A protein has these predicted regions:
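Intrinsically disordered, low-complexity segments enriched in polar/charged residues with Gly/Pro
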Residues: 4, 71-74, 114-115, 132-133, ...
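Sec-dependent N-terminal signal peptides of Gram-positive bacterial secreted proteins and lipoproteins
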Residues: 2-26
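Active-site-adjacent loops and short helices of periplasmic peptidoglycan-processing enzymes
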Residues: 27-219, 228-232
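A short, sequence-level motif marking secondary-structure junctions
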Residues: 10, 102, 264-265
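Ubiquitous "structural anchor" signal
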Residues: 19, 122-123, 289
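Domain-terminus/edge residues, biased toward the C-terminal soluble/receptor-binding domains
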Residues: 198-199, 210-215, 219-292
Length: 292
């Protein structure tokens, strides 16, 4: 039996709620709060496609809207996690919250915001050239796909490397491609967060590596996820299990990246039917984080 991970906090968006339930692994979640308060080509996508959960089909084959369910009478689930939010993606209402406004370090789930900004501001076929700064401005042990100065990938490929492999140098390169620098891109991230209604979030980088000025809340992260999953490009990437990148200096035969979100894999014991997509995260200070 595979051991359940311990998550720092959970942010979950749902398109339709029939019963308010929590996956089995959520009962073992623990967290530590901060000390201070365009369409995508599927030619290289393997195994899975996005799952539509926003409605159902009636007998005539017509789509019907997702039913809005009153959850006020449903017993609040007991979870070990100190921070979690379940948000209805259809209308933004919060169905479940536990310390939803407490600030935490998000780690790599930050990349969902990065992907959203890239999807909104870039042509997927544009070329991203990796600078020395992008490939070296990383902390020790940070996840990487081995990009070196002068390597190139398309924006499309970068998005898959970002969300499936969680490649941190790819986050840097995308930030430079969009805004010229990590600092300028972080300003765009914060402006976007504010426009989505986030009130307790501040981003300092595009990847989520440790920074005391980089934090969010379960509620704010759910708002970001709601916007991200509403974007067809991000939803397609975040729901894909494997993707093959083109050749680079360190990977002359190309590189296949695999989604780290185990709840998307039917062959994994942690698979949860109906999950559209998501992003996992981990740093030494944040612990494990998840948005789905």
């Amino acid at each position: 039996m595979k051991k359940n991970k311990t998550y720092t906090f959970l942010a979950v968006c749902t398109a339709a709620i029939l019963t308010l339930s929590v996956p089995a692994w959520a009962s073992q979640v623990t967290i530590t709060p901060l000390d201070k308060g365009t369409s995508i080509s599927q030619s290289q996508v393997q195994e899975t496609q996005p799952i539509e959960t926003s409605g159902t089909q009636n007998t005539s084959g017509e789509n019907t809207p997702a039913q809005k369910v009153d959850v006020s009478s449903i017993t609040k689930p007991t979870i070990a996690s100190q921070g979690a939010v379940l948000l209805n993606a259809a209308d933004g209402s919060v169905l479940f919250s536990q310390n939803g406004e407490t600030q935490y370090y998000p780690a790599s789930i930050t990349k969902l915001m990065t992907a959203l900004l890239v999807a909104e501001n870039c042509n997927l076929d544009d070329t991203v050239t990796f600078s020395s700064t992008a490939t070296t401005n990383l902390e020790s042990g940070a996840v990487s796909i081995g990009m070196t100065e002068g390597d190139t990938l398309s924006v499309r490929q970068c998005l898959y490397a970002l969300l499936l492999k969680s490649a941190n140098e790819v986050g840097n390169a995308l930030a430079e491609h969009v805004a010229g620098s990590n600092a300028a891109f972080a300003e765009k991230m914060n402006a976007k967060a504010a426009s989505l209604g986030c009130t307790n979030t501040h981003f300092a980088n595009p990847h989520g590596l440790n920074d005391p000025n980089h934090y969010t809340t379960p509620h704010d992260m759910a708002l970001i996820a709601r916007a991200a999953f509403a974007n067809d490009i991000v939803k397609t990437v975040a729901s894909t299990r494997t993707y093959t990148l083109s050749a680079t200096k360190k990977n002359p035969s190309g590189l296949t990246v695999t989604m780290g979100h185990k709840m998307l894999n039917p062959k994994d014991s942690r698979y949860y039917q109906g999950i559209i997509g998501g992003k996992t995260g981990y740093t030494s200070k944040a612990g494990n984080t998840l948005v789905t």
